[in-house]
Amino acid sequence: MLKHLTIFRILYLMFLVFVLIHFILGLFGLAFTPVLWNVWFFGLCLTLFIQPWTIFYKTRIFQWHHLIFQALSGFVALIIWFMIFFFFSTVPDSSMPINLDYYVIREKNEIRINRGFLLHEIHEYHDLVNPLIMKSKVKYKIEN
């Protein structure tokens, strides 16, 4: 069975296990912090971008003009990743705390997640259990 596990299957299994652990933590009222979700999301997008190129290079002969297309597609993939990341940052009620704007307040042992955009911004405060896990229930909200 181990001979059929490629590096991409192992990575996809790790990403799936992360999401399953997040949902199991959700049963106990806990969640991962945006730090872990941001790394997870970037790793998933990077893996989804690299896998087709590895398949392409395994089935084709190397030519220099492919590098130009790879660089251009890398730029387009980065823009798509940023747009999806920005979308998740502005969704007011998301079960996944993927966010651009968050602050850890160590004195009060809480994390502030800023949701929304410009005119309708919401600051959600969550208690931190440890630096990587927070309580999923919002402690209090401040709306601007």
Please report, for each region that a protein language model flagged, where it lies by residue:
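Membrane-interface helix-boundary motifs at transmembrane edges
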Residues: 1-6, 31-33, 55-69
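Extracytosolic and intramembrane catalytic regions of membrane-associated proteins
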Residues: 2, 106-108, 112-144
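Membrane-embedded alpha-helical segments of integral membrane proteins
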Residues: 9-58
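Sequence-level detector for tyrosine residue identity
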Residues: 12, 57, 102-103, 125, ...
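Short amphipathic alpha-helical "recognition" segments used for binding
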Residues: 55, 67, 74, 125-128
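Internal/C-terminal transmembrane anchor helices
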Residues: 62-92
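Alpha-helical transmembrane signal-anchor/signal-peptide segments
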Residues: 86-111
